[in-house]
Amino acid sequence: MAEEGSVRRRAGLIATDSSESRWVFQDEDDSDAEDQEDLHPQMSFDSEEEENAEQRLIRTGPRIDSFDVEALEVHGAQRNDDDDFTIGRKIVLAFQTLGVVYGDVGTSPLYTFSVMFNKSPIHGEEDVLGALSLVLYTLILISLIKYILVVLWANDDGEGGTFALYSLICRHANVSLLPNQQPSDARISSFRLKVPSPELERSLKIKEKLESSLTLKKLLLMLVLLGTSMVIANGVVTPAMSVMSAVGGLKVGIPGIKQDQVVMISVAFLIILFSVQKFGTSKVGLAVGPALFIWFCSLGGIGVYNLIKYGRSVFRAFNPVYIYYFFKRNSTHAWLSLGGCLLCATGSEAMFADLCYFSVRSVQLTFVFLVLPCLLLGYLGQAAYLMENLTVSDQVFFYSIPSGAFWPVFFIATIAALIASRAMTTATFSCIKQSTALGCFPRLKIIHTSRKLMGQIYIPVINWFLLVSCVVLVCSFSSINEIGNAYGITELGVMMTTTILLPIVMLLIWQINIIIVLSFLVFFLGLELTFYSSVLWSVGDGSWVILVFGAILFLIMYIWNYGSKLKYETEVKQKMSMDLLRELGCNLGTIRAPGIGLLYNELVQGTPAIFGHFLTTLPAIHSMIIFVCIKYVPVPVVPQSERFLFRRVCPKSYHIFRCIARYGYKDVRKENHQTFEQLLIESLGKFIRREAQERSLETDGDDDMESEDEASSSRVLVAPNGSVYSLNVPLLADFNCSDRTFSEVGTSTEVRPVHVSDLSVSDTEQSLEWELSFIRKAKESGVVYLLGHGDIRARKDSWFIKKLVINYFYAFLRKNCRRGIANLSVPHTNLMQVSMTYMV
């Protein structure tokens, strides 16, 4: 018992040892299944598997670190160090980092002062110093301290963004509203969390509170969906703002050009931008990296030029007292200018969302030693120019450029604006993919643009949707001042979401002192709420459009999550009883035809109700049935060796298995159906061999234990689903399995159950080889994909809002989303579908 207890404790804590004791493929003992399901009707089948696995675990020996497993088996996985990169590779990654991560924040000098002084006109030098001081400290506090020094460390195995934070919390506390998370998911190597301290006592109360409170779970999900909707809205505003501010420089170089012409040129650039998006980051990364490097050097150089020409008195702005003077002199106008001031930190959230496969340390060093100094010099130079030209308040950046360098800088600025827009679009794609993987966004076609590096994706529907939205926004507003206010709304929405989620990570995972956490929350949330009050005051100027846009996106995601949750819970309640399968016998009340049937469903436990419809509809069923559930777990990558989790649904003579194919939200699913079938069959063979090996070890160890385990292996899971299921059709065949012997695939004869205690070692090996041969023959006969298309409808007595949401909105989304099987490219000749409607 002591040994068993120690195994349980090791399984319950976060693994830090390189050697483990666990099975990934195993046959579970279901002796306690009925009792467990009575106590926990919504738990997955692996709740029993976890306990039995712990009783049977053996030490597997030294095992390579889980993150190294990801890197070895899946190209592009995040590594925790840069030691394996050559100097040349580091230089390449540094340039790509500039192009991917810093494009948005790097173009903020194009419009920050212009938008600020549109709200608060310049009346004297102190106004310039006050505005500059606001910009400097906003950049230092939000971009540097909050994001670069703190938020970047909250990445999920290298993945950043709102949903990465949510995924990190879900892995440490069961707060997901979709009840399909299994204890076995915690045994995925990349599921393990790294925390500063091995002691979890301080975070235990928070974890229990989050897991026990349905209200907190809903609030957390709504907060994440709200932040995600703002990220997508940001994907619309950023290209419009960046491109228009860059093209607007033409009004300085060509005084006669009109605003309508600027708008049309901006639209043309936007069309080009979104047209090349499909080529991926890696294909243009080497080009945009050097371009951004030249841009930052130009920005710093222009700043130094202006400081030398107009004086260095602007360095006084590092004294925060000028912020006080600024508000004292301008009061309301200074407060309204806060919305424009925030634009200097736009792109801070994109730095986190675009973290991707770059290391945190490299991003931090690049920002501190290149990006931040160039930005500070750029703003100081513009302020120095304004000190001598108080009447200039529009297009400040382009007016501050030396006349001889205007057109080269204009060209570089336009390129930088396009790169910044592209980076935000890429972040939007990544965010949508993460939300789709966690069941919060309708499935869409996702194209992976790189074979070597993961995370580089392209979503055609979203790409063209963003293009149309950007064009409409540019044509409707036609001014960077109005777009700038909308930009501030979306950026602050994402920032505040991160500010609220990060303290949960700090307390739950990092286990930081609560005083430090509360100080972080109060300071940054208070700061961002102050900025938010400023941008909301000007919402009547047209910025309300972006709020409506974000609200529509939020409703789409919430309705999809709500409908998916109802559908899953209904399928769990109406699943087939195992007693019924026992009564039907080994032939399932019909004829077993040669071949393998892969029945896709969303259940992680139990027999799906749609299987009964196949039995009643089809004259025969395949000799081998595998219930396949493609399940996304909240980790970036699931190693290929841990992709499939198998168990038997019935005794061996039934030839029915359950397979859960687990994918992370960064996993690349580009395999064709032949590759998927091959991987699945190989994994099934490994499962059967390990099962036989386990039985053999038990037989050699203790005859009494052997008999008990063998007896329990024939017992099956009986789940109290609360529904009565009947085929209501005459049985096509009714065979008594106990009176049959082994026969060929496709015949109506079956297997007589044989206990392990009655078999010699050679008989056991013969039984194993026979079953493997059975699988090979079934595979040669063909694999058919059995798809149950389940729809949900609200009951007639449901309240009106529920009928509207389920019968119309959710039905519309489900009808137009991409089917999950489409990723496998299954030919129609291998496909069989049955529809079923659930009343909820």
State the predicted function of each range.
Residues 2-840:
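The structured alpha-helical core of multi-pass membrane proteins
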